[in-house]
Curated annotation (Swiss-Prot):
Pathway: Amino-acid biosynthesis; L-histidine biosynthesis; L-histidine from 5-phospho-alpha-D-ribose 1-diphosphate: step 6/9; Amino-acid biosynthesis; L-histidine biosynthesis; L-histidine from 5-phospho-alpha-D-ribose 1-diphosphate: step 8/9. GO terms for biological process: L-histidine biosynthetic process. The active site is at 11 (nucleophile), 13 (proton donor). GO terms for cellular component: cytoplasm. It comes from Vibrio cholerae serotype O1 (strain ATCC 39315 / El Tor Inaba N16961). Residues 169-357 are annotated as: Imidazoleglycerol-phosphate dehydratase. In the N-terminal section; belongs to the histidinol-phosphatase family. InterPro entries: HAD-like_sf, HAD-SF_hydro_IIIA, HAD_sf, His_synth_bifunc_HisB, HisB_N, Histidinol-phos, IGPD_sf, ImidazoleglycerolP_deHydtase. Keywords: Amino-acid biosynthesis, Cytoplasm, Histidine biosynthesis, Hydrolase, Lyase, Magnesium, Metal-binding, Multifunctional enzyme, Zinc. It is found in: Cytoplasm. This is Histidine biosynthesis bifunctional protein HisB. It catalyses: D-erythro-1-(imidazol-4-yl)glycerol 3-phosphate = 3-(imidazol-4-yl)-2-oxopropyl phosphate + H2O; L-histidinol phosphate + H2O = L-histidinol + phosphate.
């Protein structure tokens, strides 16, 4: 099965090019006119990782009412213009039938896009159909993806770009086991308003350090088996938080990816982070007592170990000092400050030569 991709299935007449109001056919070069801002918008959508597929009904194409040659001249000119400006359509799907033919490929039927659906090519959460007619929205519904109705005044191409490229980086994770019941909500583009309840006061304070210094909003509630000890609560919180952070980051396009910090307070806390998609932890800190507040010091390493597993990051973290409270706090603060650098959006590029993180 092919890797699922973000695909925009885009109508032609009335969406990419102006549809003639009288005969609804672009059958001469002088009738070819692009919709406003379509080229810069398609370029931005490509930069954001979308693949472009044209899907169009062309009534009676190849018949006497719409000769193939009449269609080809303006269509090929349109494609040449797009290509010359860097816009690449990965596929052009055309239904040539009349509605009365009752074919299987005319939108909103699925015949034209059948290969994409059956081949596992479509990322259903991120893909969309863009078109000016209700049939385009019906196609989207039949494909189980989002539909966006284009209109040059109310939902033009600049609006569509903004809509598709500025999605909130928010994720919610619910994790339930026999030992814990955890709900996590992270918003990477909001700060403040953190609400953290794990049943462990010192641990709550440490998690708040990550969110505050990481520059994101965290809402977290944990009901755990603290009547036994803090192990499951700390471990499962880390797993759920790491998963939520990873989901909120999405495809990681535009992020800094890397981060590092150095001294904090009287402790020498060092942190280097790579949101690489590969979990690895190098941890160096020692403690002189078994607990700080209600948190077992042995669980500090275990927290970051579990977090790196679900966040899928490479993390080098160390701290030295004389006070265990300050050592632990410096570790969480340093991680938060480093995470802030790594998740900050700096553009649209994917920070990887592999093309995936």
């Amino acid at each position: 099965m092919s890797k699922q991709q973000k695909i925009l299935f885009i109508d032609r007449d009335g969406t990419l090019i102006v549809e003639p109001p009288v005969d609804f056919q672009v059958d001469r070069l002088d009738k070819l006119k692009l919709e406003p801002y379509v080229i810069p918008s398609l370029l931005k959508l490509q930069e954001a990782g979308y693949r472009l597929v044209m899907v169009t009904n062309q009534d009676g194409l190849g018949t006497s009412s719409y000769p193939q040659a009449d269609f080809d001249a303006p269509h090929n000119m349109m494609m040449d213009i797009f290509e010359s400006q860097g816009v690449k359509f990965n596929d052009v799907l055309i239904c040539p039938h009349f509605e009365r033919d009752n074919c299987s490929c005319r939108k909103p039927k699925l015949g034209l896009v059948k290969e994409y659906l059956q081949g596992g090519k479509v990322d259903f959460k991120s893909s969309a159909v863009i078109g000016d007619r209700m049939t385009d929205l019906q196609l989207a519904e039949n494909m189980a993806i989002r539909g966006i109705q284009y209109h040059p005044q109310t939902m033009g191409w600049l609006d569509i770009v903004k809509d598709l490229t500025t999605k909130p980086r928010v994720a919610q994770v619910v994790r339930k086991t026999k030992e814990t019941d955890i709900q996590v909500l992270v918003n990477l583009d909001q700060t403040g308003g953190n609400q953290i309840e794990t049943g462990l006061g010192f641990f709550d304070h440490m998690l708040d350090q990550i969110a505050t210094h990481g520059g994101f909003q965290l809402q977290l509630k944990v009901v755990g088996d603290l009547h036994i000890d803090d192990h499951h609560t700390v471990e499962d919180t880390a797993l759920a938080l790491g998963q939520a952070l990873r989901e909120a980051l999405g495809d990681k396009r535009g992020i800094g990816r890397f981060g590092f910090t150095l001294p904090m307070d009287e402790c020498l806390a060092q942190c280097a982070l790579d949101l690489s998609g590969r979990p690895y932890l190098k941890f160096d800190a020692s403690f002189s007592r078994p607990q700080v507040g209600d948190l077992s010091t042995e669980m500090v390493y275990h927290f970051f170990r579990s977090l790196t597993d679900t966040l899928a990051c490479t993390l080098h973290l160390s701290s030295s000092g004389d006070n265990d409270h300050h050592i632990i706090e410096s570790l969480f603060k340093a991680f938060g400050r480093t995470l802030r650098q790594a998740i900050t959006v700096q553009g649209n590029d994917l920070p990887s030569s592999k093309g995936v993180l």
